[in-house]
């Protein structure tokens, strides 16, 4: 079954893959990393003006990494705004996805957290650096193949 947004993207010859609907009836689409920035701009112009959240996860050990965006189309006088979930998958060896910071500024810290925890590099992000872990930290703690160190060096704040 195809949702409204998927039908609109097909009508305008924009490449994507429909992943169906989640348990709340929200349409989920897969977009290729190379197409993500241009489709993000189109979605913003189409009315998806609110980025509700962005997160990332490790699909499987040795597999792909995913960056997930939850977008909402907020309009005056509409009680049930349209929502869509976009998934962008990247290879583990060189996980690069275009940043959508210049489309939705609210993604700033969320993309930085995804970089810090999973190592996904968001191209053209203005401040892509670690946000939770120290800059000297080695590895990506939320990857399924991450091996936790046996010790942690605690630095004195004084």
From Swiss-Prot:
* Gene Ontology, cellular component aspect: chloroplast thylakoid membrane
User: Its membrane topology, per UniProt?
Assistant: Peripheral membrane protein
Q: Which reaction does it catalyse?
A: a plastoquinone + NADH + (n+1) H(+)(in) = a plastoquinol + NAD(+) + n H(+)(out); a plastoquinone + NADPH + (n+1) H(+)(in) = a plastoquinol + NADP(+) + n H(+)(out)
Q: Which InterPro entries match?
A: NADH_DH_suC (IPR010218), NADH_quin_OxRdtase_su_C/D-like (IPR037232), NADH_UbQ_OxRdtase_30kDa_su (IPR001268), NADH_UbQ_OxRdtase_CS (IPR020396)
Q: Which Gene3D superfamilies match?
A: NADH:ubiquinone oxidoreductase, 30kDa subunit
One of the entry's Gene Ontology molecular-function terms is:
NADH dehydrogenase (ubiquinone) activity
Where does the record say this protein resides? Plastid, Chloroplast thylakoid membrane
Q: Name the domain of life this protein comes from.
A: Eukaryota
Q: What is its EC number?
A: 7.1.1.-
Pfam families under this entry?
A: Complex1_30kDa
Q: Which UniProt keywords apply?
A: Chloroplast, Membrane, NAD, NADP, Plastid, Plastoquinone, Quinone, Thylakoid, Translocase, Transport
Fetch the PROSITE patterns from UniProt: COMPLEX1_30K
Q: Name one GO biological process term.
A: photosynthesis, light reaction
- The enzyme's first-digit EC class, named in words, is translocase
PANTHER family cross-referenced by the UniProt entry: NADH DEHYDROGENASE [UBIQUINONE] IRON-SULFUR PROTEIN 3, MITOCHONDRIAL, NADH DEHYDROGENASE UBIQUINONE IRON-SULFUR PROTEIN 3
Q: State the function annotated in the UniProt record.
A: NDH shuttles electrons from NAD(P)H:plastoquinone, via FMN and iron-sulfur (Fe-S) centers, to quinones in the photosynthetic chain and possibly in a chloroplast respiratory chain. The immediate electron acceptor for the enzyme in this species is believed to be plastoquinone. Couples the redox reaction to proton translocation, and thus conserves the redox energy in a proton gradient.
Summarize subunit and interaction data from the UniProt record for this chain.
Answer: NDH is composed of at least 16 different subunits, 5 of which are encoded in the nucleus.
Query: What family does the database annotate?
Result: Belongs to the complex I 30 kDa subunit family.
Q: What is this protein called?
A: NAD(P)H-quinone oxidoreductase subunit J, chloroplastic
Its lineage opens with:
Eukaryota, Viridiplantae, Streptophyta, Embryophyta, Tracheophyta
Give the gene symbol.
ndhJ
């Amino acid at each position: 079954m195809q949702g409204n947004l998927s039908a609109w993207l097909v009508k305008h010859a924009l490449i994507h893959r429909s992943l169906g609907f989640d348990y709340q009836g929200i349409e989920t689409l897969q977009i290729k990393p190379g197409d993500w920035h241009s489709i993000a701009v189109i979605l913003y112009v189409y009315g998806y003006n609110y980025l509700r959240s962005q997160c990332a996860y490790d699909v499987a050990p040795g597999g792909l990494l995913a960056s997930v965006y939850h977008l909402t189309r907020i309009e005056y006088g509409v009680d049930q705004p349209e929502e869509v979930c976009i998934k962008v998958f990247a290879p583990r060896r060189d996980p690069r996805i275009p940043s959508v910071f210049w489309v939705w500024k609210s993604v700033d810290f969320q993309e930085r957290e995804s970089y810090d925890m999973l190592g996904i590099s968001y191209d053209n992000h203005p401040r892509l650096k670690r946000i939770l872990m120290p800059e000297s930290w080695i590895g990506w703690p939320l990857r399924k193949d991450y091996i936790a160190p046996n010790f942690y060096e605690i630095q004195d704040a004084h």
